[in-house]
Amino acid sequence: MRNAAAAGLLADGFKEGAAGRFEETVRGTNIKIVLQYDGTRYDGWQKQGNTDRTIQGRLERILERMTGQPVEVYGSGRTDAGVHALRQTANFYLPPDSQGKEWTPEAARDALNRYLPEDIAVLEADHVPERFHSRLHAVSKTYLYRIETAKRADVFQRKYVYILGRTLDADAMERAALFLAGRHDFRGFSSLKRTRKSTVRTLDLPEIR
């Protein structure tokens, strides 16, 4: 689907206990955030050398402004250019503030929201164990694709739908979705042909509505 505005990351799933007892590390306090963003004017999640319009890049610049040190943000997944997220998960290590005090999750959340633009917002922030990693501990992801069958989309929804302009056969789509559900090896879609990492994934039954 070429119109990335139609896609959105709804939420990430994590193993129970992955965000357990708070621990400190020499790198700083490990903080997990849940954020949402409108990806319309961004070139995706991942920071890139040829653009400064990325979600990760924007977060890292603000965190460096907050701490005076470079801070790397680890996202649970990468959304493409123009794709939105309702509940994207990320984590980062915050060094002590200028007075030597550890950052609380609430203080980090409020500071980020103070400097972030209106199309990015941190919803939640929590202490997590030192070894917690948003991408490595994610066990599921949920995506939403919205397709407008009318020839002209609602003015206020046009950035969030793919305009197909013709009627879809929802019954046929539901039958086809049955072939996609289940456990499959996606090695053929991987750019890394030789990797020790498993390319087997489980696709839950898509909902067509």
Predicted regions and their residues:
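Structured-RNA-binding interfaces characteristic of tRNA pseudouridine synthases
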Residues: 10-209
